[in-house]
Regions:
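Conserved ATPase-coupling elements of RecA-like P-loop NTPase cores
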Residues: 5-17, 45-47
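Active-site-adjacent loop/helix micro-motif of nuclease/hydrolase catalytic cores
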Residues: 12, 264-273
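Conserved catalytic/switch belt of AAA+ P-loop NTPases
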Residues: 14-35
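Interdomain motor-coupling "hinge/lid" segment immediately C-terminal to the ATP-binding subdomain
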Residues: 30-31, 37-141, 166
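Short, polar loop motifs at secondary-structure junctions
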Residues: 38-42, 286-293
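Domain-level recognition of nuclease-like catalytic cores that cleave nucleotide substrates
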Residues: 61, 291-310
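Accessory nucleic acid-recognition modules appended to NTPase machines
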Residues: 92-252
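Active-site ExK catalytic segment of metal-dependent nucleases
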Residues: 255-264
């Protein structure tokens, strides 16, 4: 196996590898290449060049299974995020400095290399605005008005951040119901450390009292659940009448709902009952940052985030 430099900066590498792989006499040899990159092959327009020759594996930052499950460790991962340099920094100030620099590097260097030609100050403002959408349904009209650009341009900016693994657009599930259901995706920063840097949150005390603390923890827990569960499909569900489900997972023929509550003792809510009935869930887990696992109703259970590890 041969290591290859970061493909985001080396845009000709996929074509080069294709030539190497297709050389006469190479067909039955075991040559393998590890192609690293910080963007989806789709956004690099290179997916066809290695079609049938490559397997794409998404590698995320640290998760609770790697850092540990004691309360202090989990809170540090939530605050600083999973990038190794940010998580392992000697203190919160150094971690914040690294994350702030990483954001500027992504805006000024990585995105332009991928064809994102927006001015860096404009893209930075967009990213800062997007931080306030974390955990909310997306509405392109508002940031478009604020930035003085068109809605298609705003959507293109969002798609670039999605394809570079900075943002997750969680798509809505549309059940066969006689109810008006939300059709726009929900926006989550995949790394809460970057989210906190954009929001100016530099320490755990600041995070715990911030107005977006609950939404931040929801996004953090959601990413952990997706890594642990490895579902076949994942969505959220919401109606215009107010019923909603944070996460709907499909795996091995089962339909499982997940709610996230940053509280010491979550309780069953009317929205959970509606989701159980309307979506015909096999189970519903209410994930929270506590220590005890307990039943809330039939097929509904409160589960500590750290208890989800196999």
């Amino acid at each position: 196996t041969k290591n290859v430099p970061n493909s985001t900066q080396k845009t000709a590498l996929p074509e080069t590898l294709r030539v190497l792989m297709d050389r006469p006499g190479q067909m039955h040899q075991n040559g393998q290449y590890l192609l690293l990159g910080s963007a989806s092959p789709r956004v690099m327009h290179k997916s066809e060049s290695l079609l049938g020759r490559a397997v794409t594996l998404e590698v995320s930052g640290f998760d609770i299974g790697e850092t540990g499950t004691d309360a202090h460790t989990v809170q540090q991962l939530w605050l600083r995020g999973g990038f190794p340099a940010a998580y392992l920094a000697p203190d919160d100030a150094v971690s914040t400095q690294w994350r702030t620099a990483a954001i500027q590097r992504h805006v000024s260097s990585d995105l332009p290399l991928l064809g994102m030609n927006a001015p860096a100050p404009l893209m930075t403002r967009f990213w800062q605005m997007l931080a306030h959408y974390h955990g909310q349904t997306w509405n392109a009209a508002e940031p478009a008005r604020s930035l003085g650009i068109t809605e298609p341009t705003v959507r293109r900016y969002l798609d670039y951040l999605t394809q570079t693994f900075m943002v997750r657009q969680l798509q809505p599930w549309h059940a066969n119901l006689a109810k008006r259901q939300v059709k726009a995706p929900k926006i989550y920063f995949r790394d809460t450390g970057l989210l906190h840097a954009l929001l100016g949150i530099r320490s755990l005390p600041q995070l715990l009292v911030h107005p977006l603390s609950g939404a931040s923890w929801e996004g953090f827990a959601l990413e952990q659940v997706l890594r642990i569960a490895q579902p076949d499909e994942a969505y959220f569900w919401a109606t215009h009448q107010g019923a909603e489900l944070d996460l709907l997972l499909f795996k091995d023929g089962r339909r499982v709902g997940v709610e996230f509550k940053r509280s010491d003792a979550p309780k069953l809510t009317p929205s959970m009952r509606i989701a159980m009935e309307d979506l015909q869930l096999d189970a519903l887990y209410v994930v929270y940052p506590g220590q005890h696992r307990y039943a809330l109703a039939q097929q509904v259970e409160a589960v500590p985030l750290t208890a989800l590890l196999p």
